């Protein structure tokens, strides 16, 4: 009888512990989410800080650490938590909902910037096209100017040549006029010699 009476009270506290576990704290996932929400850290809450929060606010058993690790991994895989730092259960975690709420606000800004940037890009393109058109004649002008720059040097030479050419006929005419006089002069001494 003593053995049975000793066994019965031993069994009752086990049941009461099980009932206490069910009633003392909510699910680990809920506790982890509550811990992350309570911290509200920009860099995210670490697993150690989550464990401390749960142990301080809830009555948890000895295997709480392992349960917290498993539940954190499940929450990350399900998408409710996002891991900001580290790998696996070790690292910093944020609520995915909070990130999603922040991201849509950022996305439209990016879209606005993208929408504005093509307009800005379109304007320089138009501006680039117009100078390109202007540049083409400029290039032609430059090409014309370059030989023009080279030409001024030969052009005076040509002008000088033309002047000399113009002067040559005059000189030639003068020379021609002088030439007949010279042979006459030469002929005159010959004639004088013959006369002698």
From Swiss-Prot:
It is found in: Nucleus; Chromosome. InterPro entries: H1/H5, Histone_H1/H5_H15, WH-like_DNA-bd_sf, WH_DNA-bd_sf. Residues 104-196 have a biased composition (Basic residues). Transmembrane segments: none annotated. GO terms for cellular component: nucleosome; nucleus. Pfam families: Linker_histone (PF00538). PANTHER family: HISTONE H1, HISTONE H1.0. Belongs to the histone H1/H5 family. This is Histone H1.0. It comes from Xenopus tropicalis. The gene is h1-0.
């Amino acid at each position: 009888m003593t053995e049975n009476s000793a066994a019965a009270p031993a069994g009752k506290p086990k049941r009461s512990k099980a009932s206490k576990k069910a009633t003392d704290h909510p699910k680990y996932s809920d506790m982890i989410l509550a811990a992350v929400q309570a911290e509200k850290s920009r860099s995210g809450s670490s697993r150690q800080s989550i464990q401390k929060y749960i142990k301080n606010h809830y009555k948890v058993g000895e295997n709480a650490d392992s349960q917290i690790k498993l539940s954190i991994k499940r929450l990350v895989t399900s998408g409710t938590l996002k891991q900001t730092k580290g790998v696996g259960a070790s690292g910093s975690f944020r609520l995915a909902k909070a990130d999603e709420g922040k991201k849509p606000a950022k996305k439209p800004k990016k879209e606005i910037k993208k929408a504005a940037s093509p307009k800005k890009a379109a304007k320089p393109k138009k501006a680039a096209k117009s100078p390109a058109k202007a540049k083409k004649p400029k290039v032609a002008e430059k090409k014309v100017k370059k030989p023009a720059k080279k030409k001024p040097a030969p052009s005076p030479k040509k002008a000088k040549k033309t002047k000399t050419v113009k002067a040559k006929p005059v000189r030639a005419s003068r020379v021609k006029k002088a030439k007949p006089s010279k042979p006459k002069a030469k002929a005159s001494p010959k004639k004088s010699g013959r006369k002698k």
